[in-house]
Every structure is written in C-alpha cells, then in structure tokens.
C-alpha cells in the first residue's frame, strides 16, 4: 500500500532560515510542497522519509535565497493492482460504492464489480446484494460507514496542472465550468468470496 519513491527537486531556502540546520529547513520545505499531494503517475505523497544526497547550494543574483538540488525518498500511497484493502463506505450512487481509507477518498467500486446480483435502492440510496439462500433472496445493504474489504483492480491518474484558457473556453459562461476531476482514482472490486462488508463474513 505504501512505497518509498526516490525523487529529485531543487529546494529554495529563504535567508531568514540560514541560522537553522540545512537538513531541517529542506525537510520542512519538502513536506510543505509534497505532503498530501498527488504526483502524476507516482501516487499520493504522505511525507518525507529521508534525504539521501545534497548537492551544492547556489545563491542567484537578485535572490538572497539558497537553491539546493536534493535527492530524497518520499513515502507514497500507491497500492499495487490486486492488493486487498479495507476501507469504509463513504456513500453510494448509481455509479457504484464510494470508499474512503480516511486519508484517501477517491475509490470507486462500480456496479459490475459488486457481489451479484446487486441492485441500487433509490429510496435508501444504497447498493444491495440480493444474497440467495434456501429461504429465498436475502437483502444485504451496503450502508454508509460500514467497513468493506475490496481488491484494487485499476487506477487512474489525471493531469490536473493548470492550463491557459482556449478560445473556445472564452465563449462559455462560468456556470458551465467542467466538474473538477480527482488527480488519482482507484477502482475496486468485491465480486469474490470473502470480499465486501466485513460483517458479511464474520463467523459466529
């Protein structure tokens, strides 16, 4: 679920921080820049793990700050495909079951990846597994807040870097702005025995 990723970045340290230890100042700046940020095709950065190498620092004309090229390792949330995770149901919609891990919310289990047969209860706004028993179908509700075990089957990165307006965009009104996409999304599945709500598989 968590991996160490080697990165390189140039860190700017303002003059009023020169009295501090360089490593402490650099660590603080890197955490400010990367913590809780999604790096495209890498994952969600959690925190700095360690600094492996500091290159020479430079002060450029007109800027009293030091600029140091830093090699470091960062703790990144990037589960591998087919990994089993446990989260909580954040909500349900016709698009599927939305799951949260507490620190990461952009997880979707689409309808075709639920335990089958499944239906969406419009009145309750929840997905229901119509579990077949000898006495007939027994409805198992996927309520908000329930713990759920799922398999990661896909991931999607979206480049959310800011771009300049195009000529076509200039003619549209502000009310027609496109919906903001999540920079990193996981797709899950519970269509296997043992997956789904933890309460379904609790032995008596």
Curated annotation (Swiss-Prot):
GO terms for molecular function: DNA binding; DNA-directed RNA polymerase activity. Residues 158-175 have a biased composition (Polar residues). GO terms for cellular component: centrosome; cytosol; intracellular membrane-bounded organelle; nucleoplasm; RNA polymerase III complex. GO terms for biological process: defense response to virus; innate immune response; nucleobase-containing compound metabolic process; transcription by RNA polymerase III; transcription initiation at RNA polymerase III promoter. Pfam families: RNA_pol_Rbc25, SHS2_Rpb7-N. It is found in: Nucleus. Keywords: Antiviral defense, DNA-directed RNA polymerase, Immunity, Innate immunity, Nucleus, Transcription. Its main location: nucleus. InterPro entries: NA-bd_OB-fold (IPR012340), RNA_pol_III_Rbc25 (IPR013238), RNA_pol_Rpb7-like_N_sf (IPR036898), RNAP_E/RPC8 (IPR004519), Rpb7-like (IPR045113), Rpb7-like_N (IPR005576). It comes from the Eukaryota. Residues 158-179 are annotated as: Disordered. Component of the RNA polymerase III complex consisting of 17 subunits: a ten-subunit horseshoe-shaped catalytic core composed of POLR3A/RPC1, POLR3B/RPC2, POLR1C/RPAC1, POLR1D/RPAC2, POLR3K/RPC10, POLR2E/RPABC1, POLR2F/RPABC2, POLR2H/RPABC3, POLR2K/RPABC4 and POLR2L/RPABC5; a mobile stalk composed of two subunits POLR3H/RPC8 and CRCP/RPC9, protruding from the core and functioning primarily in transcription initiation; and additional subunits homologous to general transcription factors of the RNA polymerase II machinery, POLR3C/RPC3-POLR3F/RPC6-POLR3G/RPC7 heterotrimer required for transcription initiation and POLR3D/RPC4-POLR3E/RPC5 heterodimer involved in both transcription initiation and termination. Belongs to the eukaryotic RPB7/RPC8 RNA polymerase subunit family. DNA-dependent RNA polymerase catalyzes the transcription of DNA into RNA using the four ribonucleoside triphosphates as substrates. Specific peripheric component of RNA polymerase III (Pol III) which synthesizes small non-coding RNAs including 5S rRNA, snRNAs, tRNAs and miRNAs from at least 500 distinct genomic loci. With CRCP/RPC9 forms a mobile stalk that protrudes from Pol III core and functions primarily in transcription initiation. Pol III plays a key role in sensing and limiting infection by intracellular bacteria and DNA viruses. This is DNA-directed RNA polymerase III subunit RPC8. It comes from Homo sapiens (Human).
